[in-house]
Amino acid sequence: MKDFLKNVGATVVGLFLFSVIATVIGIMGIIGMVASTEATQTTSDNSVLVLKLDGIMEEQSSQNEIANWFSDNEDGVQGLQETLAAIKKAKTNKDIKGIYMEGGSLAADMAQMQEMRDALVDFKKSGKWIIAYGEAFSQGAYYVATTADKIYLNHVGVIDWHGIGGQVAFYKDILAKVGVKIIPFKCGKYKSATEPFTEEKMSEPSRQQTERYIGGWWNTICQAVSQSRGISVSTLNTYADQVLSMEPAENLVKYKLIDGLLYNDEIKDVIKKRLGLDKDDDIKQLSVADMENMKEETNGDEVAVYYTYGDIVDRVPKQNLLQNNHFIASEDVCDDLESLANDDNIKAVVIRVNSGGGSAYASEQLWHAVQKLKAKKPVVISMGGAAASGAYYLSCAANYIFAEPTTITGSIGIFGMVFNKSELMTQKLGIKYDEVKTNRNSTFGSADTPMTTEQMGFIQASINRGYILFKSRVAEGRKLSMENVEEVAQGHVYLGEDALKIKLVDELGGLDRAVAKAAALAKVKTWYTGSYPEPQGFMEQLLNSETVKGNFLDEQLHLTLGVLYEPFMLTRSLQQMDPIQARLPFRLQVN
């Protein structure tokens, strides 16, 4: 009877919670539908576009309204696509007189910031002004802000200027303590993704290539800031060594990093003066979202821009309503590319790629889908912050490849890792195993028993075949010999500017140049762009999600395991991922 009452009580509580959640979601759904029917945004004279150099930036703004609602960032995830479009519209809109950039901590990759900066430099060609102000500027935010005519800081504000560094954690010893061993398999001396689990420090090849690309990023930042602010690169490096965030704001004026110190109310007066307004007048502000709602002309033929970013997987894993992760799921992308191929209204396709790779199997399927698309219409790749390993695999099938100078690309190689916890189970936990089998390798693949030399040979042979196939795809797509490909492969990571020299990409430039090239290949004189895939509707997001219980369990694990949480999650992810991977060892952001 007691158990029965418990079950009844649990059911009642569950129904109550479900009704509350359903009500909240229903209200949000109605709000979303009402918002989607809002009138087209219009502008009035003396308007200002406001850009916030703060928060997370993805290729596209977040369409998950529930995740945005619970996000620490009040504006949700910012989209590079929407930001660039807003700057471009502001350049030609006669009512918009300038751009006001609000400083903060911008979490964007190097190529995204470079594209933003290029768009702002182009905006200034219109003769319009840009003003930047903030209580604090992260290093990346300051890099973008130096396009401004004037940069102001709060009297007690800070600029974080310290150079670029990256750390890699190595888990070999802690895994050994709990009886877990990672057996690595790879092709390519630069393919270092297995090192955190099998080594105690970075290998020399890994260190060399990492130093090259973070050094290239830093040089790009310093050269741009030097040109904008009239400060030598050597002086900027001296400032970085001083850790400017610890210095008083007055020093930053002396160093010519900023133009003055103002309080929040005073910066408004500066903007009003630029607009010719009286002190009591209001500033007409437009956000990126406002600009997105402005009507655009769609003359000519369509060039589709298809966005792919995140880990490459076979299919999208279930996420709870509060998660907002992105994946390149081969099942979905292949279907989408086939639809674009069959749409006669679309004359060319630009695939925007920002990924460090993932499943080798999924990468091969994506390569095939791009090949089929290319047979019907021109395909141009626009690389973002990264288009490496599996992401380069799919890219090499295109007609033409654009990369930013700071794009991370290449990493032509394959690796695999086998998770073996036999020592944990038998020696640490005291679990005994016995087995019955019909053949010598019937239990092959079990993580609870040690692998034989023969079994390890099977896996390495599979890795070798995948590597040869990967290289053959690159050779075919880039019109190189297998010998040439081997010279630049080995898992070596390149900056976009270096990849151009070895023919892994065709040209340096951003998304706009990629679209123009696609139109030229299709022999289209006038065009407009369409963005794909179309975002999921509210109900589709809801039906494809899980409950929020995953977040609660994850939080409890974090509290219970403490410092052991990260290695636990890493080993769990190893068990869940495809056995053969084509991905970058790690990703760095310029904060």
Walk through the language-model features, giving the residues of each.
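Intrinsic disorder and flexible/low-complexity segments
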Residues: 300-303, 307-343, 462, 533-591
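Short glycine/threonine-rich loop-to-helix capping motif typified by GTGT followed
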Residues: 360-365, 498-501, 541-545
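Charged, glycine-interspersed solvent-exposed loop segments at helix/strand-loop junctions
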Residues: 172-270, 422-502, 506-507, 512-518, ...
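Flexible, low-complexity junctional segments that flank or bridge functional domains
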Residues: 3-48, 59-61, 97, 122-129, ...
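C-terminal long alpha-helix characteristic of the crotonase
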Residues: 227-228, 259-302, 415, 471-477, ...
